[in-house]
Amino acid sequence: MKKTLISLFALFLAVAGASAQQLVAGAAKVDITPKESELARPTDIIRGNLYVRAIYVSDGHSATAIVGMDTHCHALEEVIRQSAASTGVPAENFIISSTHTHSGGTAGIGADNKPSQEQVQAAIVKAVDLAKAAARPARVGFGKRPLDLNVNRDNYNEFQEWEQAANWTAPCDKDLTVITFLDQEDIPIAVYMNYGMHPVNFFMSGVVSADFPGDACNLIEKVFGDKTVAVFSQGASGDVNPKLAYTEIFQETDQIKGVRRPHRATRGSLDLSTKEVSKEQLAIHKAMVDRKDEYVHMLGNAMGFKAIEIMLYDTQYEVNPAIKGAETIIAVPGRERIDKNGRENYDPGYTPADDRHIGVGLVQIGDITLVSVSGEIYTEIGLRIKHEMPTSKLMIVALADGPFESGYIYSNNAASHLTFQVIGSRLQPGHAEEAIVNAAKQLLKDAK
């Protein structure tokens, strides 16, 4: 009898060990900064390096790959296929997203950009490979705290016009959410940050920059002696900017003429071409870039130090969580804009179009849940997901994985806004919010 009990106990230990292996995590980054010779204009500058950063996590049975890039890459299906074949990470367990910097290359968010799409795709595959090769025993933890840097940017002004400007009473998610992977010496292997705020500070300025996400990541990596890789992802930021974005202090003028807010609403189109700065304007341009540089440093440093604060005081760590992943594609009725010549503050008219497809994914690391959406979702959609999902440790990652067919994904309440985001969206009103929220909830239900 005693022998039988010992045998049963040994069997129990073996089964328990098989189902609860030590978590391992690794991280890496690959430089994708363009060369100075690739800059589009002689007056353009490179403010700092651009990276693809990756985190690999495995529980011994399954794995996930989390990637952030300081540029954009829309052809991710083939990248995921290649990386899945190389690393063994299931395709549904990838979260690849852009930091959404508007200055992440020689053409910003334009098509003719360096780094090229091919360079970015290769860097993603390489970064995940390197992250897996660096994997070591780890603990994982989740934390969040409010960080008051952002503001809703859908504003109906005193002239009864819609414009892109600070709206202090509209919804805005202030949570900075952080997932940390610690090694056995309590050094962060990787830090995954999430915050909703557009990195638009160097948009159309001729400056190549990762903007505040890059500054935040660089700070954390520097604090921990470059033993850590920090990755940034966007939350629900479709209608959110930094508080001082596009204000008078960042106008290219020879003298700041006070603290009034410029009147920005426009019916006309926006010229997205960046021109060479003239010799006469160069000093003024450099002064503006210097002001933006200081502001971006402040945003990045505030975010980076707040993330470290969260890691120290608001995070409980787990050793052996299980990893799960799932994804779905939802179809939302589409529309085609008739008048495409204006920017905002008018109704362009629409005709019905084919359905637009939006990817919704879910990755779980123990009791931590990451929901990904393949578009720029409005704040109210993100807040609704947080409110209705039956989990407290939740991160919402926007601009992830694809397909990228929708344009901005505005909330039901924002359907009447004549901002450039809403009138440019390829989605009919009243459908996307419900479909995304329900898809996320169903994925979580199916995972249990």
In which residue ranges do the predicted regions lie?
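Bacterial N-terminal signal peptides
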Residues: S7-A16
